[in-house]
Amino acid sequence: MKNYLASLRTDIWRTSSARYNAARRLKRKELFSTISLALFSVQTIALAVIQKIYAKEFNATGGLDDYATSLSILAGILIIAISLMGWGSRNGSNADALYKNAEELNALQRSVNLEINKIEADSVEDWKVAEDMLATYEQIQSRCDINHSPLDDLYFITSHRKSPEFAYKKIQGYEARWVSFVWFLSSIWYYLIFWVISAAAMIPVLSAISLVARTICTPGFG
């Protein structure tokens, strides 16, 4: 019976930790969503200001004004898309729900630890305790209708690969590092792509303005 409770304790530990990981991942996703909204909002305003201040440079470069306008429109579309994605996925509220559920599971894990330490004989009463603990575990786990992803669970296992409970999996260090890298990027990779595309799209505008400005300022120009 003690072995059974130890196994249940491992399951609770694994579930609660995976849900902590899921909560952290969703919070990071929400943060990058907010940063992206701010970034693209600033870009839209900056392009409008640049087009106004450097009107002469824009007029001197064919198609540059239309290109900058297209970038402003694209940034506006991304703002709408990210806002809708954030509203639909409810990352913040889901993260809070997962975190609270993980806290409940942690409390149950401590109770299981206490019962393991109290067990001295294999008796009917002991098995009744185990059944009650299992029922409580199932109840708490089902109380949260948002589940963690398999990647959150895998990240937990690889992070504790040297623990006796998971040593049999023989997970190598490079595998753990790769899972950690993938887990970190899993919730933000598309935001990073948006940032890179946005920054790359601004290069022609800034380069053209700089080139025309230097040409205009060159002695003898015109």
Language-model regions: role of each:
Residues 27-93, 176-221:
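Alpha-helical transmembrane segments and their immediate juxtamembrane boundary regions
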